[in-house]
UniProtKB/Swiss-Prot annotation:
Its main location: membrane. The modification Glutamate methyl ester (Glu) is found at E630, E637. This is Methyl-accepting chemotaxis protein McpB. Some glutamine residues are deamidated to glutamate by CheD and subsequently methylated. Residues 1-16, 304-662 are cytoplasmic. Pfam families: dCache_1 (PF02743), HAMP (PF00672), MCPsignal (PF00015). Belongs to the methyl-accepting chemotaxis (MCP) protein family. It comes from the Bacteria.
């Protein structure tokens, strides 16, 4: 874990992409797995408890139908019998015959009997009674007389005659002269109750309204109910409740039989729902692992396809920023990264051409500066010779003619030197102007590159906006698929309920059961298809998110390219400024050379005047001396300017040496 954290602390685009993609891959799957597990647990709970409730309700209906028919018979006898029916032996025999006939044709009826308010008792079939038996002292008689003509159903009890579980249904005679009652065996009902399955290990039980067991898997009949859940169950006529019994969580569904007041309940262990849901969890984990493996391979491929060109682009940009203009960027993709690589290559080619032209111009300027310096030196020496000749001429008239000729010869040499200086200065000026134009062209190339980089940036932002739109639409489709999936689940549940109802209907519902099964299969297929589509949409959303991260990183790299291009632009602006400054110096030097040429002509005219007018030699010599001194000062200025020009050319050469073009 510590190694992974240290790995994350080192920032890189590949790490960011890998972490982002893995998070986008795992988080939705975990959320979907958690929600699927919760949903499956809830649906299994609803399905199992729904089946249990249906079984309990069905058994409750069976109890009502079975005992209801017997209660109607008791009501019939209570309305047809009167006080006179118990008087006289013939009347009593007639009653017994009716009772016997009903017992013989109705299974589950143990006996029918009646008692009058005078103590008379009639029963069928005939059984031996205790001596002094008085029906008026029996609970069934007393409860019925207190009920005011309503049906009375006793709690179940074990019959002393045959050990069967029976209940008694009793009702007061219509004229109030006695009570008629019927003992009914409920062993068959109890056997049906034992067949009720609630989950795998759950069971059903019956309790009386007096909170005693009628039938239970682990308790005897008549045993009192105990536990916190008892009060909750008797608080409502029907419902569901959760409770803990013997440190085990259980869930119960129950209802109340209207005729008997019994509580009919089905209970199961909560662990069954958890065990049934484990298969969903296991399947989800398998899907998660498979998705991580497949997604990881795809993520590595995508990350490498993005970061590999970016690394080459960054490395080449650093090489170019260090002055190596021979570097080329090889990106063969046709996307924005490929276009950016082509733009960098075009910029490098433009820079190489520009630097090469500048170096040629600088070499020409340096050579011309050296020639100018040499010519200025020669001219300075000639001027010194003229000055010395004038001084010698002023010392004696005898040497005047020779000095004048020597001065005339030196002036001719000086004129030739000045013409050479003028031509060299003109060449340097042209080279400087050409360098300025080339620097301006380079600056335009850089500005065009900046414009193209900005265009790429706008294209990336527009593509990012389009991808975001696709992401929103994909999420809308996912929402619709979830609705379809919910409808399919509901259809599946309805089909299961229909199959249960068809199973209860027996042979008459077999066709409906087949149709329900087909509907359930279609619902399952629809749900599976919806899940597959939802999975595909989620993969599309993940790829869209990947594209968005790619656009952001490309946008950042484009911004870095803009910074590098701006730095290059500033360098060319500096070169352009220096070439302009050199052009200004050259123009100043041209003006100085022109002035020097004019002065040289004046000196030549003065020397000619010396040859023609000897009398004015003294004044002419002074003029020549003054002109010679001015000429010497001008030559020193030219020499200084040439030196400065040579230094500036050397500095410009040093600047261009930073760039490698071959």
């Amino acid at each position: 874990m510590k190694t992974f954290i240290n790995w994350l602390k080192k920032p890189s685009i590949s790490k960011k992409l890998i972490v982002s993609f893995i998070a986008i891959l795992i988080i939705p799957i975990l959320i979907l797995e958690f929600s699927s597990y919760r949903s499956a647990s809830g649906k299994l709970d609803q399905e199992i408890m729904g089946n249990a409730k249906n079984s309990v309700d069905t058994f409750n209906t069976t109890v009502t139908n079975d005992l209801g028919e017997k209660a109607k018979a008791v009501t019939f006898f209570s309305e047809s019998l009167k006080r006179s029916a118990f008087k006289g032996k013939s009347n009593q025999e007639e009653i017994k015959a009716k009772f016997s006939q009903y017992v013989s044709i109705n299974q589950g009826v143990a006996r029918i009997y009646g008692g009058a308010d005078n103590g008379t008792y009639v029963q069928a079939p005939k059984e031996k009674l205790p001596e002094g038996y008085d029906p008026r002292q029996r609970p069934w008689y007393q409860d019925a007389m207190k009920a005011g003509g309503e049906i009375v159903v006793t709690d179940p009890y074990v019959a002393a005659s045959d050990g069967s579980m029976v209940i008694t249904i009793a009702q007061e005679l219509k004229d109030g002269s006695g009570v008629v009652a019927m003992d009914i065996t409920i062993d068959k009902l109890l056997e049906q109750m034992k067949q009720i399955k609630v989950g795998k290990e759950g069971y059903a039980f019956i309790a009386t309204k007096n909170k005693t067991y009628v039938a239970h898997k682990n308790h005897k009949a008549g045993e009192k109910l105990s536990g916190d859940w008892v009060a909750k169950m008797y608080a409502n006529d029907s419902g569901e409740l959760q409770y803990t019994l013997n440190n085990e969580d259980k869930k119960m569904t129950y209802t109340t039989n209207e005729l008997t007041g019994w509580k009919i309940a089905g209970t199961m262990y909560m662990d069954e729902i958890k065990d049934a849901s484990k298969s969903v969890l296991t399947t989800g984990m398998i899907v998660l692992i498979a998705s991580i493996v497949a997604g990881g391979i795809l993520i590595l491929f995508i990350v490498r396809s993005i970061t590999k060109p970016l690394k080459r682009l960054v490395q080449s940009s650093k090489t170019i920023s260090r002055g190596d203009l021979t570097e080329t960027i090889e990106i063969h993709s046709k996307d924005e990264l490929g276009e950016l690589g082509e733009s960098f290559n075009e910029m490098g080619q433009s820079l190489r051409s520009l630097i090469s032209a500048i170096q040629d111009s600088v070499n020409n300027v340096a050579a011309s500066s050296e020639q100018l310096t040499a010519s200025a030196g020669q001219t300075s020496k000639a001027t010194e010779h003229i000055t010395m000749a004038i001084e010698q001429f002023s010392n004696g008239n005898e040497e005047q003619s020779e000095k004048v000729e020597s001065s005339s010869h030196q002036l001719n040499l000086m004129n030739e030197g000045l013409q050479q200086v003028s031509q060299t200065s003109s060449d340097i000026t042209k080279a400087s102007i050409q360098s300025t134009e080339i620097a301006g062209t380079g600056e335009k190339f850089v500005q065009q590159t900046v414009g193209q980089m900005n265009s790429i940036n706008q294209s990336v932002q527009q593509a990012e906006a389009v991808v975001k739109g696709l992401e929103g639409k994909s999420k809308d489709i996912t929402s619709i698929l979830r609705v379809i999936n919910g409808i399919a689940d509901q259809t599946n549940l309805l089909a299961l309920n229909a199959a249960i109802e068809a199973a209860r209907a027996g042979e008459s519902g077999r066709g409906f059961s087949v149709v329900a099964e087909e509907v359930r299969k279609l619902a399952v297929q629809s749900a599976d298809s919806a899940k597959e589509i939802e999975k595909l949409i989620q993969e599309i959303v993940a790829e869209i998110d990947t594209s968005l991260h790619m656009f952001k990183e490309v946008n950042q790299e484009v911004q870095s390219g803009l910074v590098v291009t701006d730095n290059t632009k500033e360098s060319f602006q500096s070169i352009f400024s220096m070439t302009n400054e050199i052009a200004g110096k050259l123009q100043t030097m041209n003006s100085t050379v022109e002035q020097l040429s004019d002065r040289s002509q004046h000196v030549s005219a003065a020397v000619s005047g010396i040859a023609d007018v000897s009398k004015e030699s003294s004044a002419s010599i002074q003029d020549i001396a003054a002109s010679a001194e001015e000429q010497l000062a001008s030559m020193e200025e030219i020499s200084s300017s040439a030196t400065t020009l040579a230094q500036m050319a050397e500095e410009l050469r040093d600047l261009t040496k930073q760039f490698k073009i071959e």
